[in-house]
Amino acid sequence: MKKLFIIANWMQGKALSGGDRIFIELSKRWSQKLDISIFISKEGADICSRDGQNPANKIIWASDIFSGHYTVDGVYRTIIGIFKALSIRAYQGDIILSSSDFLPDAIPAFILKFKNPKVKWIASFYLFAPKPWQKKSPYKGTKYLLGLVYWLSQLPVYYIIKQFADIVFVTSQPDIKLFITKHRGIEKIIPVRGGVDVLPARQYFEQEEFIPFENRSYDACFVGRFHYQKGILELIHIWKNVCKIRPHSRIAIIGIGPLEKKVHNLIIHMNLQANIDLLGFLNGADKYEVFKKSKIIVHPATYDSGGMATAEAMAWGLPGVAFDLEALKSYYPKGMLKTECFNLGAFANNILYLLSDLNAHLTLSQEALALVKEQWNWEQQAQSILHQIT
């Protein structure tokens, strides 16, 4: 049995990123065909246990001592990862998967590849950092320095992965061409859109006890990290516009992250306490209960490479509303209303349209269900990717 070493040393907090979800779900489904070891942070180990990924070989590298301090924590975890990688023995035929493009994951994987060029390095590179001075960057004003550090730290990683990785996981079709080299053809750059566990939703619909549209508690829901890229602050402004037309509209917000305090303060400032329920981090059955009670899924990301959480909600028949980002064109060709980028008023109008036009809602709902069935099934994704990497 081939060995797979997964490096997930950058996992932080309690929230689950799209990249984290990808390696957890894939490794669950590969565990019978590969001998898997995971080198992970303390927080990452807790997240994996919570999500049912408990391989026999789960080795904790970084502690959470500097968690929340982005730059210091990145340096600490990278140094820990380097020393740990120097002590690992990997042999010809072994597979190394770096779960993100962040330095604490990518650099240790590169060291293992450098020590033994015969191992196969699969590098995950799911999102190019925006140039902080560009118009589309979410890192403006006081966020500029954070965006600059993020962008600068990714430059050496991109070079190393492009030059030395055997296979690259990306999420967006437009990113494929950026990793083609003389030694790596297009077949070695694999778009990994992620997936959805469709079974719970299928069982729910088969029972024929689903909640009618007019009886659902929430007009919309949001799932995602409280991060500038996810548009969580923009969402509060959008919901204010919705409530100007429909004063009693309610939205469920699922997630946690570094912007929690700003989100709380903005809700109070806009007097939306009665219209917005902050539910924190939810997973599994608790999250599904919110989907059952919601009418729409909103994805107001301002910079993104996909958006897997939206597909989860679509599996429960929720049509989506999002900005018309380039990456979403291939991810969500149907089942979603696309809005002119960063026009908050137009975004609110699309929400209001789906809430008032039941025929339009039904059409998009059926499209969403079909899209998930066709393109987002985890079992199909996992088997297809395994075939390509082994």
Residue spans for each PLM region:
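Nucleotide-activated donor-binding/catalytic signature segment of Leloir-type glycosyltransferases, i.e.
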Residues: 264-282
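N-terminal subdomain of nucleotide-sugar transferases
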Residues: 1-51
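Membrane-proximal helix-turn-helix segments that form the acceptor-binding/catalytic region
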Residues: 111-114, 129, 144-168
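Conserved donor-binding/catalytic core segment of Leloir-type glycosyltransferases
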Residues: 212-230, 236-239
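Carbohydrate-associated surface elements
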Residues: 174, 195
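Conserved acidic donor-binding segment of nucleotide-sugar-dependent glycosyltransferases
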Residues: 336-345, 353-358
